Amino acid sequence: MSYPTVSCKLIGIHGHAGSGKDTVADYIRFTRENTWKIPFARALKEACVRLFGMPLESFHELELKEAVHPYWNISPRQAAQFFGTEMVRETLPRLLPTIGSNFWIHRLAMTLNGLDESMPYDSDDVVVIPDVRFQNEYDWIIANGGIIIHLTRPGADGIVGIPSHASEAGILHTCPERTYPLSNQGSLDDLHAKVEDILTEANVYPFDNPDSF
């Protein structure tokens, strides 16, 4: 089963909940031109807002993600985990058999290729994806020439939301030459410095690196 292609550069961030994925993505986005942060789960979160009547910020702010909704008696994280995985990844292939479990990949590719009323992203653009959770998402980014930042942090063990959920199970780093480990256990400045080292080594922004010419 083939993956959709995109023209922009991709930076995927993989790590357990609470490891600092959004912090890293926001740092890259705000310190570089032509850089955008677009999660796989953007459309999922928007759908959950409509389905469950939960505010959008409850899917973005760490404390609110775990807060149990008084009506549904589940947290926003649990809602997104179940709807995104059990309902879409595992059930939607019955309707869309040609894409298998790759719906969220195709949905993001639609946006990046300008097929959902958005402007297309081209080779001058860098898109940071802060929520790489499944093997096919990792493989798709690698297949499109992107890199993966594997983020770890003490205490971020994936025990959140639905117990033992597949979205927190981890993935195999089958392309180590384009997978960059990053340990988030120091200060914010330390984290930023490590991100800069990765961006330089991976040559994501060649104009930042005179040695690349």
Give the residues covered by each predicted segment.
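Extreme N-terminal, non-catalytic leader segments
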Residues: M1-I11
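Short, hydrophobic/glycine-enriched beta-strand segments
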Residues: K9-A17, K37-P39
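Small-molecule kinase domains that catalyze NTP-dependent phosphoryl transfer to phosphate-bearing small molecules
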Residues: H14-A17, Q135-N144, H150-F213
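Conserved lysine of the Walker
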Residues: K21
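Hydrophobic positions on the alpha1 helix immediately C-terminal to the Walker A/P-loop
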Residues: V24
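Post-Walker A helix-loop "phosphate-sensing" segment adjacent to the P-loop in P-loop NTPases
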Residues: F30-K37
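ATP-dependent NMP and nucleoside kinases share a basic, alpha-helical "lid"
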Residues: W36, R107-G161
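ATP-dependent small-molecule kinase phosphotransfer cores
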Residues: R42-D124
